[in-house]
């Protein structure tokens, strides 16, 4: 993303955003990397820590573990020409693949069935054969933290995902990055991998940043 990265305009400060899994991790990383004592701050109601590294402004924010949670789309609709689709909580229509053995509309309007599909929210017994094939969407779990994260991401010149070094951490980081990308599509992104909160370990991790591991995140999501 180097060539396409957003460049700060004249007079605009560069900000590196570091995203950790928990508030304590954000606090410790700021203390270990900062040239001086970090400044504790809040974005809305979320604690963040601001500090300086070689003249560049950095800010760390801690999540609360998973900030998104998977769920089935709340309904399915069927059209003769296009087949089945899922309808997300936001009303977006997404592809769905259901077996041909399942009955298709028109249905009588008796819950959970509608004229052109199936309502899945109530987990009615009659809907279960359809539910297991419904598309999965990710819904906000920690809305306040997501709001704060997006506020920082808008202003970020680069983003470092510094969640835990395991598949769960990779998934949490991937979800956080998805939220950041909604407001900042071009900032370069890298991954800090570390196994202990010591100055040598954290310094080494941030001096040797790597790409995100999509396969590891997918493994976390399939659990």
Q: What residues fall within each predicted segment?
A:
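Intrinsically disordered, low-complexity regulatory segments
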Residues: 12-223
């Amino acid at each position: 993303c180097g060539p396409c990265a957003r460049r700060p305009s004249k007079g605009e400060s560069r900000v590196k955003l570091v995203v950790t899994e928990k508030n304590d991790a954000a606090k410790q990383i700021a203390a270990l990397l900062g040239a001086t004592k970090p400044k504790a701050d809040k974005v809305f109601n979320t604690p963040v820590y601001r500090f300086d590294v070689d003249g560049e402004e950095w800010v760390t924010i801690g999540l609360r573990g998973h900030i998104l949670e998977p769920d089935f789309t709340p309904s399915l609709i069927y059209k003769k020409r296009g087949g089945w689709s899922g309808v997300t909580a936001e009303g977006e229509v997404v592809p769905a693949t259901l077996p041909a053995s399942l009955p298709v509309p028109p249905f009588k309007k008796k819950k959970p069935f509608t004229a052109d599909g199936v309502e899945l929210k109530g987990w009615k017994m009659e809907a279960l054969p359809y539910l297991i094939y419904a598309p999965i969407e990710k819904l906000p779990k920690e809305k306040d933290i997501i709001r704060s994260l997006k506020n920082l991401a808008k202003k970020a010149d680069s983003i470092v995902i510094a969640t835990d070094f395991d598949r769960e951490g990779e998934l949490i980081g991937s979800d956080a990055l998805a939220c950041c990308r909604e407001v900042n599509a071009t900032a370069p992104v890298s991954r800090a991998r570390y196994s202990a909160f010591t100055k040598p370990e954290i310094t080494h991790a941030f001096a040797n940043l790597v790409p995100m591991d999509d396969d590891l995140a997918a493994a976390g999501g399939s659990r």
